[in-house]
Amino acid sequence: MQSSAVFSASPSLPLLKPGRLSLRHPVTASSNLSVSPPNVVSVPPLPRRSWRLASSDSPLRAWSGLPSVSSPSLDTNRFKTAATAVPEEGEGSGKMTKVLELGLLFAMWYLFNIYFNIYNKQVLKALHAPMTVTLVQFAVGSVLITFMWALNLYKRPKISAAQLAAILPLAVVHTLGNLFTNMSLGKVSVSFTHTIKAMEPFFSVVLSAMFLGEVPTPWVIGSIIPIVGGVALASVTEVSFNWAGFLSAMASNLTNQSRNVLSKKVMVKKDDSLDNITLFSIITLMSLFLMAPVTFFSEGIKFTPSYIQSAGVNVQQIYTKSLIAALCFHAYQQVSYMILARVSPVTHSVGNCVKRVVVIVSSVIFFKTPVSPVNAFGTGIALAGVFLYSRVKRIKPKPKTA
């Protein structure tokens, strides 16, 4: 009886014959089960089976009636892994957002430049008053700056008299640089003006060596050679060449690079309220006051409807194109400083080189400027030299070992 009771309680119940389970033995089996040794009933193997099931992420874990001791730790590990994966995904999306934002800024920079050069050229060709056009551009920029400061769209700076005195030379050369550029655009094609302006690195190297004592590296000197050679080749073969336009563009290079040298020489002290955009805004306001008396004394008042009509030009078109050109002039310089705050100076220089290529190509297409193969080759060499200069100017010479 004892052996049969133990046998009937074993896990192999399906092997029993149905005829042996009768009502004659209803109680003896359960009474013997209470004294069975633990090694007879096969319960211990079950936790090992439930351990293997609990180690997976499948829904079969709920099928086990015995909780696993390691389950909470495994859940915690999975929670930590998921928690650390979320910031990485957020960082990736954040980087992608910054890249898209930077790409949008570069596109705006190039687009504003294209529109400025096209509309500015049309106004200068019709009006023949570069000083008046330059004054209008400074005036529109000053109105925008005042509007931003009045509405607190940009923080209004607190400038001391000493800082204004230090900024004044920068405003003078900034005014002259834009005036000479407009004088050149009024005399020669847009593509030729920007080809000549590709010689800015040459003036930068010469002025930095003269006033700052910066000796150029052989790499920099090597990059200047194709710039000078390309501009010379393009100038010889330029259809619209005249000395007034050529010398005006050269003077623009000289004044613009003098501004960069002066900014290093004067060392304007900057605080939190005087960043690049604020400095540009102050220079624009000062340029307006510098340009106004010179314009009225030299050209008089030529932006009136009566004068424009006497020149045989549509008044509304001149006003509209002048306004668009002035807005684009101020916008592309603001965007340029925004890009400079996000990238390295080398990247900004490369972007500026690409911008010049885009402006030259777009102006040639829009104005249908005749370009000979030799002229295009010279322009290409000059721009390639500018690109090379932007890459090698940051290379520092190796220190001499004793």
Curated annotation (Swiss-Prot):
An example molecular function term from Gene Ontology annotations: phosphoglycerate transmembrane transporter activity
Superkingdom: Eukaryota
Signal peptide: none
Keyword Transcription: no
SUPFAM superfamilies in alphabetical order: Multidrug resistance efflux transporter EmrE
Classification via Pfam families: TPT (PF03151)
EamA domain location: 118-236
One GO cellular component term noted in the UniProt record for this chain: chloroplast membrane
Subunit structure: Homodimer.
Name of the protein in question: Triose phosphate/phosphate translocator, non-green plastid, chloroplastic
Species per Swiss-Prot/TrEMBL record: Brassica oleracea var. botrytis
Name of the encoding gene: NGTPT
